[in-house]
From Swiss-Prot:
Source organism of the structure: Saccharomyces cerevisiae (strain ATCC 204508 / S288c) (Baker's yeast)
Entry's localization field: Endoplasmic reticulum membrane
Annotated GO CC locations: endoplasmic reticulum; endoplasmic reticulum membrane; membrane
UniProt membrane topology term: Single-pass type II membrane protein
Ranges for region Disordered: 56-79
Main location: endoplasmic reticulum
Glycosylated residues (UniProt): 45
Function (record text): Putative mannosidase involved in glycoprotein quality control since it is involved in the targeting of misfolded glycoproteins for ER-associated protein degradation (ERAD).
Protein name in the entry: Putative endoplasmic reticulum mannosidase MNL2
Length: 849
């Protein structure tokens, strides 16, 4: 009792002193914080002195241009008398590092110039520059009813082909023993992660090699995946995702070995570093040791590769119950949704986009104070070591014009069906399949109560554009579109709408029937071509005039679209009664045509498939007269019909977009701004393809904008009589004469067998297994002929063209994709059933929750 009284007495004596101490501490803290804010404001106004190597230690070999040690700090600071600002020499590495703390780099592409000076001790830890304040929540799937679960595979039994399975497993083990992946992984421990080993791990498990699988996992367990080995200067984020993260997840899903899941979390956490940008879009070529960490994503990136992480991150979020992985995916697809109308082809992204979302302010706009209005404008540093002001639009943009390219060419947008673009369609569909159509990644809507929580900062960050910038857009004749398409804050651009319109564009403008050496009755062979577009907005008519030029170059990667379309035909469309979608029968028909065309190509090239090739389009498709004639082609070449010129831009006829009389693409309203300039804004319209008109909204005049397509002259290869000798190519006698160009032939490619596998699993038709058996026979025969040695021995090697850099290692896609698809094609239908599993872009397996 006496102790309690003593404590109480002591408290009464010190409580006034304690209160004074707390008050003084708070006063000191806020005074110190105010000093920090003042220093930061100096930095924001360029009031800090330039820093050189005499003042700061810059140990480490900088990749930037070396500073001029003969000049002093005062020599590097000059006053700009016109605007009263201090011009800082950002080419000095130390100065650049200091300024980069406050101003992000805005670069066209990643390069070694961004530096690599971080001390080793700081590489394991990472503090985000742009942390997420409100994460999207991963949607719950617990309330999905059995009636909502769709079936991909047919109800019939799909029995195994035991003989083919044995042949494929034998080839896998021959390849595995030849490569000695376990030994190589240990020998290369200091220089790289065991990427090839991880990439082939799930196929090893499917082959039933339990002992080898456990040995492999034991080796992988010894690696630190929190950061890469120091020898790995630059990390290809899409490649690391598809081969390492997906490989670890897939092996975990099959074996349930939690060591693999822990390693997958480490890899994913490292990949998340690349998302630490002002708009949370990843840097794909990631220099992880650079001390210049404050960066926008690159201004020239392959559009589809921005979605590569989607499936792995979503599945990892489900497994770990951590929202940060799902949040990263949702923000990328939110930006895609905002960009659906930014480019010439609506609902399509070109090959290359500006991922920074930055619209640079002009000098006139800066002088008029536009850079001071709105939180969406950030002062940044470009690749020329100059300050620029970037207005963040929250969407992907056209990449900046290359000064070295022809002005005429740089005005075109390129759309191809290849590895740069297909992942967007593929991942949109497979995410929909993963969620069993209960959640839409584009519009953020869910059938469940636990839908993804919207980040309140999204949308509010992109403020209304200042009238000065609006004037510039109007004078330049560019269309001014809102980045939103919402009614009552609910998006009308969902995955179904995006996929439907994107595939419709492909069907209409990017498919062609080629001239082939032989035509089979009742067979229609089609390939997917590329297009170049150029547009001009006509304010007087409120039309976007888009000129389209077709180029009949084909990427072998486009053969994957056959399987993707086939899969999409088995998933019911999501949406209301007025939602437009492509009939499953049409999707299935096109998927069969593409897959059969690619298989025909494999036969014609004896398995040596060109990664890129160029064909002649059929000139008499109406009558079905598409058989190639070498004499006719030689005559056309002699007559100069294949001679082309850079500015050969003759246009053809105008065509409407979808259906009769064109398609009203987007409702608009004209709003008169303060200075009399008319601004065209988006009105929240109906779903794509609808002709519903909106007469009046909020008393504003409403007009309709529509795309008017003009078919320009086809782009042909430049061929003269000097390139031919009779009915064959002079410099490439091994090329078929019906093919105008062949690039990078490969033998072990997986694109065609992947589509054949999908077509069999969704239909159960034996013709697809027959194609698979034929293609495997062609592959084995070609391998033995090209790589035979003494005493009948032969090795498995990839084929490389003369002059190409030869890699003696087997490519890991041979294990992770090619052999896996062959194995699953001939396995029992319940083995990795598509009703319960999804195969990712990298060929890895994740479960549907």
């Amino acid at each position: 009792m006496s102790i309690a009284r003593l404590v109480y007495s002591l408290f009464r004596r010190v409580r006034s002193v304690l209160l004074l101490f707390i008050t003084i501490s708070l006063l000191f803290y806020y005074t110190f914080q105010n000093e920090i804010d003042i220093l930061n404001s100096y930095a924001l106004n360029d009031s800090l002195p330039s820093i050189n190597n005499y003042e700061h230690n810059t140990e480490g070999s900088s990749k930037l241009d070396p500073p001029d040690l003969s000049s002093t700090g005062s020599d590097r600071i000059a006053t700009d008398k016109e605007n009263g600002n201090v011009a800082v020499d950002l080419s000095d590495p130390a100065t650049l590092r200091e300024k980069n703390k406050y101003f992000p780099l805005l670069l066209k592409g990643s390069s070694h110039q961004i530096g690599s000076n971080l001390p080793i001790s700081s590489l394991l830890t990472y503090k985000e520059k742009y942390p997420v304040l409100f994460e999207y929540s991963s949607p719950s799937l617990t309330s999905i009813s059995q009636n909502d679960v769709h079936k991909i595979q047919p109800a019939m039994q799909l029995p195994p082909d035991v003989d083919m399975i044995k042949q494929i497993k034998d080839i896998f083990m021959k390849s595995w023993n030849q490569e000695q992946l376990l030994l190589k992984s240990n020998l290369r421990r200091e220089s790289t992660w065991p990427i090839d080993l991880i990439d082939s791990l799930d196929t090893l498990y499917l082959c039933g090699e339990t002992k080898l699988f456990q040995d492999s996992v034991n080796i992988i367990e010894d690696f630190d995946f929190r950061v890469p080995p120091l020898a790995m200067e630059v990390i290809d984020i899409p490649d690391i995702t598809t081969r390492v993260l997906e490989g670890l997840l897939s092996a975990y899903e099959l074996s349930m070995d939690k060591r693999l899941l822990n390693k997958a979390k480490h890899v994913a956490d490292f990949i998340l570093r690349s998302f630490d940008t002002p708009n949370r879009i990843p840097i794909l070529k990631y220099f992880w040791k650079s001390d210049l960490r404050n960066r926008f994503p690159d201004r020239t990136v392959p559009s589809g590769q921005l979605t590569t992480m989607a499936l792995a991150f979503i599945r990892l979020s489900q497994l770990t119950r951590l929202n940060k992985y799902f949040d990263a995916v949702e923000r990328v697809f939110t930006t895609i949704r905002q960009s659906y109308n930014e480019f010439d082809m609506e609902f399509m992204l070109p090959d290359v986009v500006d991922a920074s979302g930055c619209q640079l302010l002009t000098q006139e706009e800066i002088e008029n104070g536009a850079h001071l209005k709105g939180s969406s404008i950030m002062k940044s540093i470009n690749e020329n070591f100059k300050f620029v002001h970037c207005q963040q639009l929250g969407k992907f943009l056209n990449p900046p014009i290359d000064d070295n390219s022809l002005q005429e060419q740089s005005q075109y947008q390129a759309y191809r069906i290849n590895e740069k673009t297909v992942p967007i369609l593929e991942n949109l569909f497979k995410i929909n399949d993963l969620f069993q159509s209960s959640y839409d990644i584009l519009d953020g809507s869910s059938k469940n109560a636990n839908a993804a929580t919207m980040d309140p900062s999204i949308g509010s960050e992109v403020e209304a554009v200042d009238e000065i910038i609006e004037k510039r857009n109007f004078k330049d004749g560019t269309k001014k579109d809102s980045t939103k398409n919402t009614v009552g804050d609910k998006s009308l651009i969902d995955s179904q709408t995006f996929l439907t319109n994107s595939i419709s564009n492909i069907f209409k403008f990017m498919t062609f029937r080629p001239m082939l050496p032989k035509q089979t009755e009742n067979k229609k062979f089609n390939f997917l071509n590329s297009i170049l577009t150029k547009s001009q907005f006509m304010p007087t008519t409120n039309e976007l005039d888009v000129t389209i030029r077709k180029s009949y170059d084909v990427s072998l990667y486009s053969c994957r679209l056959g399987g993707i379309l086939g899969l999409s035909s088995r998933v019911p469309h999501r949406g209301g009664v007025n939602t437009k979608y492509i009939l499953p029968s049409s999707l299935l028909e096109m998927s069969e045509i593409i897959t059969e065309s690619c298989f025909m190509l494999m036969e014609e090239f004896d398995g040596l498939l060109p990664q890129k090739f160029e064909l002649d389009p059929c000139t008499d498709e109406t009558n079905g007269n598409c058989e190639f004639n070498g004499e006719t082609k030689s005559r056309m070449i002699a007559n100069g019909e294949y001679e082309t010129f850079e500015n050969d831009l003759d246009v053809g006829i105008k065509v409407s977009n979808y259906g009769k009389g064109g398609n009203d693409q987007k409702a608009k309203r004209n709003v008169l701004s303060k200075d009399g300039i008319t601004e065209t804004q988006n009105i929240k319209g109906d779903t794509v393809g609808s002709s519903k008109s909106i007469a009046e909204i909020d008393g504003d005049e409403v007009t309709q904008i529509r795309r008017v397509f003009t078919l320009g002259k086809d782009i042909k290869p430049h061929i003269t009589t000097d390139d031919t000798m009779g009915s064959q190519w002079k410099n490439h006698p091994d090329w078929p004469f019906w093919v105008n160009k062949v690039e990078s032939r490969r033998l072990l490619d997986s694109n065609i067998i992947e589509s054949i596998f999908y077509m069999y699993r969704i239909s159960g038709e034996q013709k697809w297994r027959s194609m698979g058996k034929q293609s495997f026979g062609i592959l084995m025969q070609e391998l033995m002929e090209l790589n035979s040695g003494a005493k009948g021995l032969w090795q498995i090697k990839e084929f490389y063209e003369n002059g190409e850099k030869v890699n003696n290692d087997l490519p890991s896609y041979w294990f992770s994709r090619t052999l896996k698809y062959y194995l699953l094609l001939f396995s029992d239908g319940d083995k990795v059933s598509l009703d319960k599993h999804i195969l990712t872009q990298g060929g890895h397996i994740i479960k549907k929750k």
